């Protein structure tokens, strides 16, 4: 298998596993929303936000391990790679226990209005189990065992969906949290018995400091991205309460699923981008990755965004009518995900060209813009749609700054920049026109489930018919002289640095 097909295969593993896992989580989210109600579902989303931030208690050691252990494996320093993984496991576990202890201390403060304290005790337990699971995934990726990593992700999603929904049905949110902890333990056991993947703890202060120094800037960037995707929900939780959060956050299960494909592609593509740019020593390679990659990815995602926009109202209308207010903001954010998708390749190229600080600044600017926009929307009583527009402004800000910086670093001349941005803008305009036209041409049928399903299918078919020629053309172009060809090894007879 040549390098290009190897990269595509690895991307396929990562993307397929993420979509299968997120599809199961969508089922889980719908089940939880139904059995817990808006207030209970809002409480779980508040806890989930806390869990996301607690996932970075290791201060970047996982990211540092992913970089250094991968290099050690590539140079056949297996013992050193294992020691690095063991050190990262120790830092990860100590950080998780420290955060869990902090949560336990906070909930023990008398008079603190946090509701059922035992739920937060369970959350503290989830911090430890979740963080060790995240370490396990990073450890597998450092060994390039993408297939096994993907299989375990699907297993965890399957267990947490089945047992989690049953737990919520029987015992409410407490049952769901207990089931989630059990699922992590079952996943660990499976990993240990079938793959030999169980963390071997190593105490090495020097290596721990090295891993943290390497991974901390990466962690800050990831933390800013998490904050950007959650700043709207955090402000809704603080300013409007958990009931409003439960209604607003339901749509995030769809938007999160959409973002998994470019995230999976970026995760696999980044090391190959670095290698390709480093080998070629040519600025033309950077330009090719940036422009051709963004064009291909945005073309591929447009039909997915269109289908998600048109399908979103269907399950909410018939399965979760209490959450009907989440439809419009959800559709706004589905369209808004076009911006970070288009900027995915730009981010990888920017980091490969030494622009990590610029990317951090872009993320920080996106968080600030989103925070201001959402805060003003809530204070002015603008409703959920205005809140979603504020969040969308943050996504556009980050994507715009990172893309502009990547174009500068890659040395794109002004005509090329204008043409590149114009293509992306026209593609987004076409996406908006297509979904609006399909919704107008084929109206919904809220009185009949069967007819509503048929009409939704027809709307999606019309949208796909519009995007099909462009997708086919992009794929043929990629097969003929694909942008991933730049990642081929030097000396390959088909390599071109023109």
Description of each model-found segment:
Residues 1-7, 121, 147, 151, ...:
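Interhelical loop/hinge segments that connect adjacent transmembrane helices in multipass membrane
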Residues 121, 156, 170, 365-369, ...:
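Transmembrane alpha-helical segments of multi-pass transport proteins
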Residues 1-26, 78-82, 86, 205-221, ...:
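N-terminal membrane topogenesis motif
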Residues 59-75, 142, 251, 255-294, ...:
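Helix-loop junctions and terminal segments of transmembrane helices
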Residues 120-121, 150-197, 214, 364-372, ...:
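Hydrophobic alpha-helical transmembrane segments
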Residues 3, 107-123, 291, 309-338, ...:
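Interfacial segments at transmembrane-helix termini and the short loops linking adjacent helices
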Residues 128-151, 199, 334-365:
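Membrane-interface junctions at transmembrane-helix termini in multi-pass inner-membrane proteins
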Residues 9-26, 156, 176-187, 191, ...:
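Transmembrane helical elements of multi-pass membrane transporters/channels
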